[in-house]
C-alpha cells in the first residue's frame, strides 16, 4: 500500500491539472486554462497548492463565480480527481489575465 504524504501528493500535480483541465473544458469549453504560482515557477513545497487560472471572456459576478467553481470541482470529482488534491482555482476575465502576465509566470495548460 502506498503511503500518501504531502510530497507524494505534490509529485503528482501534473496529473491533477490534466484531470482538472478536462473538467473545466466540459463545464466551460471557451475557457483558457493556465498554471500559475509555485508550480509554474518550479518552486513547490510540501505546503504548496496548485494554482490554476481559468480565464473567461468577461468578468463574472461573485455568485456566478462560486457556482462555476463548484460545478468544475463536481465534474473533476466525476473524472476521479482525488479529494486530497491541493488545487486552488482562480476564475478571472481576459482583462485580469493581463495583470497576471505582468506580475508572474503563467504556463498554458497544454504545455504541462
Ranges and model annotations:
Residues 1-35, 40-47, 56-112:
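Catalytic core of pol beta-like nucleotidyltransferases
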Residues 51-52:
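Structural signature of the urease/amidohydrolase superfamily beta/alpha-barrel
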